[in-house]
Regions:
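A short helix-breaking turn/cap at a secondary-structure junction
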Residues: 1-72
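Short helix-loop capping/hinge segments that flank enzyme active sites or metal/cofactor-binding pockets
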Residues: 39-54, 102-162, 175-178, 183-187
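A non-catalytic, amphipathic alpha-helix used as a structural packing/dimerization or gating element
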Residues: 11-14, 68-71, 75, 149-156, ...
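Flexible, glycine/charged-enriched surface loops at secondary-structure junctions
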Residues: 24-30, 77-90
Length: 192
């Protein structure tokens, strides 16, 4: 669930119940379950079709992480669910590129708005981290045409996921494909 990392199904259900649904005046329709998730999790689910993958586009989990995913899949099978390897048919490279454009351009707008509120045109190096200044520099001149292409890819990608979830109830993937870098290696992430 985007925005929530929890240790229990109960906590995740409570998070979704608290956050689901539209804000007042929302122009998009929202699906809601017939009852709160905190009540739905109190009973056993029907047999689920669970897709599983340790690959996501060009990225593949390390053997250790893939083995842990397999272990989770076997556990779910032991509970009576159908588990198999499957992925949505998507152009993952295009989707990653669109998400990167979205993140960088949205981030640049947020930083630019903060700067404008303070009468600044450039991020002060003593207040903004170097990586964030670089993201701002890269995203601040994103064109409308780039944003329109990004939205078109989002539309195609979401339709691919929609078609996938006509056949599958859940897709189970690792949160991250690689182990967390050691603290001493963080400097290399900021190197030019």
């Amino acid at each position: 669930i985007q925005g929530c990392q929890s240790r229990t199904v109960r906590d995740t259900a409570a998070f979704v119940d608290a956050c689901r649904g539209p804000a007042p005046g929302e122009f998009m329709p929202f699906w809601s379950p017939p009852e709160p998730y905190t009540r739905l999790i109190a009973r056993d689910p029907t047999r689920l079709k669970i897709a599983m993958s340790h690959r996501w586009g060009d990225y593949q989990s390390t053997p250790h992480i893939a083995a842990e995913l397999d272990k989770a899949g076997r556990f779910l099978e032991s509970l009576g669910h159908h588990v198999d390897y499957a992925l949505p048919e998507l152009d993952y490279r295009e989707a990653f590129a669109a998400q990167t454009t979205c993140y960088i351009s949205n981030f640049a707008i947020v930083i630019s708005n903060m700067l404008a509120a303070r009468g600044l045109t450039e991020p002060p190096e003593d207040l903004i981290e170097p990586i964030n200044i670089r993201i701002w520099e890269h995203g601040r001149h994103t064109s409308y045409a780039e944003r329109a292409r990004m939205q078109a890819v989002f539309n195609t990608t979401s339709r691919g996921f929609g078609a996938f979830f006509e056949d599958w109830d859940i897709i189970l993937t690792p949160i991250t494909a690689l182990p967390t870098p050691n603290h001493s290696t963080m400097a290399t992430l900021l190197s030019p």
